[in-house]
Amino acid sequence: SKIMQEFDLIYHRDIPDGSQIQNGKIMRTRVGDKFKYHVVLTVKQPKKKPLSVPKNTAIGIDIGFRRVSNSVQVATIIFSDDKKPPQDILAPQKMISAIEHVLELQGILDDAATELGKKIKPLLNETPLNEEHQKYRLWKALAKYPNYVTLSFETAYKAARYLQIEPDFIPEKAAQALLEWWSGHSRRYRELHNLRAKQLLNRKHFYRQIASELVSHKKLIVLEDINLTIFAEVKDKDNALSDKARAQRFLASPSEFRDAIINAAKRETVPIKNVPPQYTSKTCSACGIINKELGAEKEWTCSACGVVHDRDVNAAKNIAELGKQ
């Protein structure tokens, strides 16, 4: 066969002994102006017997995205049968700083694209494009945004790149403004995409390390049954999160951490259980009284028994106990 391309193959993880590779495909994803390739293999593994674990012990995990000093607290973990102190999972400060830089770059590009949209929208609407043009949808994305929606920097960048192929794609004044925007922000755009891809990969690796450590204890793992997809990482019409909370959500990505734990547990046949999330933070783990008046406070005192609770630790204890029931 003719050799079209040679490249190094880096294993995400080893193929288990006795497994059979059923098929494979090459996936290409764009990162800025470059492409990244992944070889994805579908592997059939031998069936493992479910792991037998003690029924009187559990690992309770309270997943969240609370800001702590220079980092973000991803979760609080407690071992119900051990004398170990509760463990807060904090994202590495270096990773958080890098992702915050990504958010800063994104904010700069967002603001610049918003100003660009104010300039070129009237010019584009004066000279509509033929609907049969191959880039009509791109032109429409530039020109037909409602007044309350700003121009995306992704759309602006794509249009600027296409202008270098077809300079008459849009009116001359609009094209000039778009190319000036591209000249001033193209390097920042590429930096954003490259850093984002790198840091998201670092975050995924960090979470998989934590998940592997958890399943190595070979104990029941208990999580709250929460649909974390409702906390979107980006703005959308169904998301009421503040900008600050949304940024912390992006930094921590609880759904990615949860998926890493579930995948590791399935791989090692460690049992995992979901419990109802209602009142896990508000229920006193000492006497069982529910503090319905509790807001977002980190610490609170039970009015019945006087025990002072750390909100996250208390939730993890209750989650573990619910899992053992």
Regions inferred by a protein language model and the residue ranges of each:
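Acidic carboxylate diad motif detector
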Residues: 1-32, 80-81, 251
